[in-house]
Amino acid sequence: MGRIGTPVFLAFLSALTCSLQVHAQVRDLKQCSNDPEFGRYCPTTCGVADVLSKYAKGVDEDSSFIDSVLTQLAAKHGIVEGNVNIVNEDVRITRDEAQIIKDSGQKTVQKILEEVRILEQIGVSHDAQIQELSEMWRVNQQFVTRLQQQLVDIRQTCSRSCQDTTANKISPITGKDCQQVVDNGGKDSGLYYIKPLKAKQPFLVFCEIENGNGWTVIQHRHDGSVNFTRDWVSYREGFGYLAPTLTTEFWLGNEKIHLLTGQQAYRLRIDLTDWENTHRYADYGHFKLTPESDEYRLFYSMYLDGDAGNAFDGFDFGDDPQDKFYTTHLGMLFSTPERDNDKYEGSCAEQDGSGWWMNRCHAGHLNGKYYFGGNYRKTDVEFPYDDGIIWATWHDRWYSLKMTTMKLLPMGRDLSGHGGQQQSKGNSRGDN
């Protein structure tokens, strides 16, 4: 489609302008001008009509073209506007996704920081566990070393006496206790059968014979080879091993001890040995156990003598003004881990892992846990209480003794041959 040239379009605009001006003047004068110059500089109406007629077709074509262009522009504008909306939506979505990513990133960072904190706590906990395990390993190594030495000693002993049997070492001499065995001709320490007056059948015991006195041994600790964490029935019937020499560990049994001490008055001697191989003892008069119906209650009339001190009478540990009262053993019932007869709101026997005449709890405990070397600490025990073999009037409660022996002799026997160790009754610590 052709377009109006620029000169023609300008001439058209000039003529139109002049015509409008003349029309305005004629309107103002309300009459036509007869001026002969009229139309010289400004085309007349007829001239304008000619020009319009001449270029009207081109103007119409250009107008149509312009309309077409405008229509196309409008369409393109709609497309552009749609694209802009799409872009805006994409921007919004992108912003939302960016916010989500930001939030997720913050959560991830927080999670990582929390995991780092947890790992730090685990690290601290592991350090403490490593230290604890290291200490346990050290203690176990010491224990293994001692066991290895004991194994060597046992093998050496076996190599010397493997031909001997317990059966061949039991003497045929018998009696109601070891003193009667001596009275009936027994001369050497060893294994004998005795039958207390009310016993239904005889039972085997170790008799320690010295200077004409026959001691009936009811308990012995020697090397930790026997576990003293036992129940009520085991302590009632007895456990451990009897040997021709006093080199094994055992508990004779509460029922047997009751039968023995119920037939006459007996002296109880407690022999103690520490890890420096120092020996001390404590003697009690008229020692006896009541029957099982009374929970094998412990009785004695007095502390006779000894250089180990009277731990059965209790001891002031300095923890409580009533420590001595809480730790006396006179009149106490026998307790085992599963049969609690003590005066404590907890269970002394369960915490200590053994049977004994517990109060709340004890000052002397010869059935406690065996600790090699003597000294032990709170960190070595399951509960924060002393559970070793203790005699508080000699060594403190965190020292476990090496060897103990509990033995009975009828009251009234002459003990002048006991190394001149007759002493008056005392209550001071034996190691002061």
Curated annotation (Swiss-Prot):
Residues bearing glycans: N227
Keywords: Blood coagulation, Calcium, Coiled coil, Disulfide bond, Glycoprotein, Hemostasis, Metal-binding, Secreted, Signal
Disulfide pairings: C178-C207, C348-C361
Subcellular location: Secreted
Region Disordered: start-end pairs: 413-432
A cellular component term, taken from the record's GO annotations: fibrinogen complex
GO biological process: blood coagulation, common pathway; fibrinolysis; platelet aggregation; positive regulation of heterotypic cell-cell adhesion; protein polymerization
Stored CDD domains: FReD (cd00087)
Biased composition (Polar residues): 421-432
PROSITE patterns: FIBRINOGEN_C_1, FIBRINOGEN_C_2
Pfam family, one: Fibrinogen_C
UniProt-annotated binding residues for Ca(2+): D340, D342, Y344, G346
Modification note: Conversion of fibrinogen to fibrin is triggered by thrombin, which cleaves fibrinopeptides A and B from alpha and beta chains, and thus exposes the N-terminal polymerization sites responsible for the formation of the soft clot. The soft clot is converted into the hard clot by factor XIIIA which catalyzes the epsilon-(gamma-glutamyl)lysine cross-linking between gamma chains (stronger) and between alpha chains (weaker) of different monomers.
Domain Fibrinogen C-terminal span(s) in chain numbering: 169-412
Cleavable signal peptide: 1-24
GO molecular function: extracellular matrix structural constituent; metal ion binding; protein-macromolecule adaptor activity; signaling receptor binding
Binding partners and assembly: Heterohexamer; disulfide linked. Contains 2 sets of 3 non-identical chains (alpha, beta and gamma). The 2 heterotrimers are in head to head conformation with the N-termini in a small central domain.
UniProt comment concerning the protein's domains: A long coiled coil structure formed by 3 polypeptide chains connects the central nodule to the C-terminal domains (distal nodules). The long C-terminal ends of the alpha chains fold back, contributing a fourth strand to the coiled coil structure.
Function: Together with fibrinogen alpha (FGA) and fibrinogen beta (FGB), polymerizes to form an insoluble fibrin matrix. Has a major function in hemostasis as one of the primary components of blood clots.
Protein name listed in UniProt: Fibrinogen gamma chain
Organism: Petromyzon marinus (Sea lamprey)
Upper lineage: Eukaryota, Metazoa, Chordata, Craniata, Vertebrata
Gene giving rise to this polypeptide: FGG
